[in-house]
């Protein structure tokens, strides 16, 4: 699917974009 939060992440980091969560290896909209 799509992930409108254009950010990569690791399990120990939080996504800087508000309303997004980390689902390794990218951030997804909540």
From Swiss-Prot:
Keywords assigned: Disulfide bond, Knottin, Plant defense
Tissue specificity annotation: Detected in stems (at protein level).
Coiled coil: none
UniProt keyword annotation of Transmembrane helix present: no
GO biological process: cytolysis in another organism; defense response
Disulfide bond residue pairs: 5-20, 9-22, 15-27
InterPro entries: Cyclotide (IPR005535), Cyclotide_sf (IPR036146)
Keyword Oxidoreductase belongs to the record: no
Cross-link (Cyclopeptide (Gly-Asn)): 1-30
Post-translational changes noted in the entry: This is a cyclic peptide.
Highest taxon of source: Eukaryota
Similarity comment: Belongs to the cyclotide family.
Function: Probably participates in a plant defense mechanism. Does not display any cytotoxic activity towards K562, HeLa, MCF-7, HUVEC or red blood cells. Does not bind to phospholipd membranes containing 1-palmitoyl 2-oleoyl phosphatidylcholine (POPC) or 1-palmitoyl-2-oleophosphatidylethanolamine (POPE).
Domain description: The presence of a 'disulfide through disulfide knot' structurally defines this protein as a knottin.
UniProt name for this protein: Cyclotide hyen-C
Organism: Pigea enneasperma (Spade flower)
Lineage: Eukaryota, Viridiplantae, Streptophyta, Embryophyta, Tracheophyta
């Amino acid at each position: 699917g799509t992930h409108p939060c254009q950010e990569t992440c690791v399990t120990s980091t939080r996504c800087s974009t508000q309303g997004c969560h980390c689902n390794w290896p990218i951030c997804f909209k909540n």
